Amino acid sequence: MLTLKLISEETERVIKGLEKKHFEGAREAVEKVLEYDKIRREAQQKLDSNKQQQNQLAKQIGSLMKEGKKEEAENIKTTVADLKAADKALQEIMDKAQADMTHVLLDIPNIPNKDVPEGKDASSNVVIKEDLTNMPQLGDEALCHWDLLKKYNLVDFDLGVKITGAGFPVYIGKMARFQRALEAFFLDEARKSGYLEIQPPYVVNEASGLGTGQLPDKEGQMYHANLDNLFLIPTAEVPVTNIFRDEILDEKDLPIKRCAYSACFRREAGSYGKDVRGLNRLHQCDKVEIVRIDTPEHSYQSWHEMLDHVEGLLKKLELPYHLLLLCGGDMSFTSSICVDFETYSAAQHRWLEVSSVSNFESYQANRLHCRYRHSEDKKIELCHTLNGSALALPRIVATILENNQTPQGIRVPKVLVPYCGFEYLDDKND
């Protein structure tokens, strides 16, 4: 959530930032916030004035009673009663203005960092780095991953439909072990980089969804347990970041680095055409998330370190990849800046997103009331929050399957062999 201070002091910059993000009605939304704030402040001033007047009148009543001027004192008591009645009305005005202002603020996205390119959609994203060292050269008979999964009996999509519905695959034999190997590898690499592992709940309350910005923006894409008003998590970012909701951290303890594996659940409402085939787009997937909490001065250093971490994983998995700096119109609701990592899927002849690494600056922290205390002057300030996928499994698996297919089976990247205990993914389960 944008701070009221930022909106009040840098109104035009905020409006231009929202327009860069292609947020419709940017000026109107900002003007609503300022109008509700004006109503709230005016009511507060009147309330403060009333309180001051009541204190003065209370002293007069005391003096008059001592002097025996009871009738005059009673008249003043009537005035005090009227002021107290006015106080109640003013408090109601303040509360309503605050609620209305918060409602509008929750629907306003974050503004982009100055380095974010202009653009409305993915066509304006900018490739800022690429490594094609491991680009495979496959023949015309190369199979897409969904055909490979069927050939080697590694995933049963029909069984998932029987048990739950489309988008909930069942992993079998070596593929189940391969999934577990990837999760362990990603977590171990995060631990080596200084991240403390968390095993979070997969279900969160409404306050947690609001805190990280999935609510109200992404409510339609989340699975909602209506009876208990709980939500299945779309990413471990939600429970892990909410650990620090309503906390005041010490500057000396920053940056805070956490990682977590979780299953992730997304309704993914809408039609995506070819994107839905195989593992390209699922309702349930597995992912390791890295989260950092830092000071405003150091958050971009943290962000670059997170980019380096994700890039290191892709190198170790021997995959071709590139980094996309997202344009304003293609960024998430909460991001200030975001880089997507995509790997090349050789049989599909397309790039697949496998990670997003974002700096939210103070946007999430303002919703979360996540703050830190300066070591020297003890001043309390909003933290910056960051997160990234390190990595998301389904599309990583898809690219490994397609890029590493051989007549003997799917060659397992060398770094994963110690984790899964075999060198090829095939139908020979031992």
Enumerate the language-model features and the residues they cover.
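TRNA-recognition modules of translation machinery and tRNA-sensing kinases, especially anticodon-binding
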Residues: 27, 130-430
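N-terminal alpha-helical targeting/anchoring segments
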Residues: 1-134, 154, 158
